[in-house]
């Protein structure tokens, strides 16, 4: 979304240039995942990305994905884990702001999410990198990315490494996004690059029904019959956050 974003009433929209079921704003990890799931559910999907290519902040990240509960990589590396142990650790690590229902869903579905990533082409090497670094300099696929093995957490839940890293030395976010964007581009979803979201469009009841987009100065109005999903969460365009 641009800094000048506003909410425009649908009654002021003279015509819809594009109509779709779901409009996804932002093609980072969240946007690509949303687009893939929406297409899989049978929706027509348009994806908007203000950059000339997708990836966003996700592509420049370390790409470490927190997965557990007994993934194939954990098992092949000799570590036992379960959704319950993962749940107990996350409940302790998240402190007073934890949401038990969300954490339970995250832990219970974690192995399925691993298989989802692999199914979309993301590779993981079943080798444990023992030296904590946050991001291994090797292409090893499993690290301790949190405090699972530290007191007091190792007294609350059985420790297990859960940092899953796509198979490439160094920052793996680029490989993660390369695979997810390639998966999106194999679907009927329509990525629109160099396009920014200028405003959301809402009806008289306040329901968001579309968005106003701008590509190289040309405005287009997109109607989203089933919803607009905002996944433009990257901070790289926020100068204050970059300076911090």
Identify the meaning behind each predicted range.
Residues 20-47:
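N-terminal Rossmann-like FAD-binding beta1-loop-alpha1 element of flavoenzymes
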Residues 1-22, 40, 178:
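Extreme N-terminal leader/targeting segments of oxidoreductases
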Residues 16-20, 216-227:
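Core beta-strand elements of the Rossmann-like FAD/NAD(P) dinucleotide-binding domain
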Residues 105-218, 239-240:
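Conserved redox-cofactor binding core of oxidoreductases
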Residues 66-106:
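Glycine-rich active-site loop/strand segments that organize a redox cofactor
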Residues 40-61:
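Glycine-rich FAD pyrophosphate-binding loop
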Residues 26, 214, 224-225, 230-232:
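Short, well-ordered coil/turn residues at beta-beta hairpins
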Residues 230-244:
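Flavin (primarily FAD) binding-site architecture
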């Amino acid at each position: 979304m641009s800094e000048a974003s506003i909410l425009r009433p649908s009654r002021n929209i003279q015509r819809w240039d594009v109509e779709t079921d779901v409009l996804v704003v932002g093609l980072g990890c969240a946007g690509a995942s949303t687009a893939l799931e929406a297409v899989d559910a049978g929706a027509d999907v348009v994806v908007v990305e203000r950059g000339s290519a997708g990836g966003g902040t996700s592509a420049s990240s370390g790409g470490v994905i927190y997965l557990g509960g007994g993934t194939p990589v954990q098992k092949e590396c000799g570590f036992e884990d379960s959704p319950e142990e993962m749940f107990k650790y996350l409940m302790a690590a998240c402190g007073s702001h934890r949401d038990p229902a969300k954490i339970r869903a995250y832990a219970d579905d974690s192995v399925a999410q691993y298989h989802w990533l692999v199914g979309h082409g993301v590779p993981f090497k079943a080798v444990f990198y023992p030296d904590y670094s946050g991001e291994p300099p090797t292409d090893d696929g499993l690290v301790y990315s949190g405090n699972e093995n530290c007191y007091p957490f190792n007294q609350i839940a059985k420790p297990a490494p859960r940092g899953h890293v796509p198979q490439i030395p160094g920052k793996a976010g680029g490989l993660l996004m390369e695979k997810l964007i390639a998966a999106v581009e194999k679907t009927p979803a329509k990525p629109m690059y160099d396009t920014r979201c200028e405003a959301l469009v809402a009806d008289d009841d306040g329901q968001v029904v579309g968005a106003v987009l701008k590509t190289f100065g040309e405005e287009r109005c997109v109607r989203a019959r089933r919803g607009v999903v905002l996944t433009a969460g990257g901070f790289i365009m926020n100068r204050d956050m970059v300076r911090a």
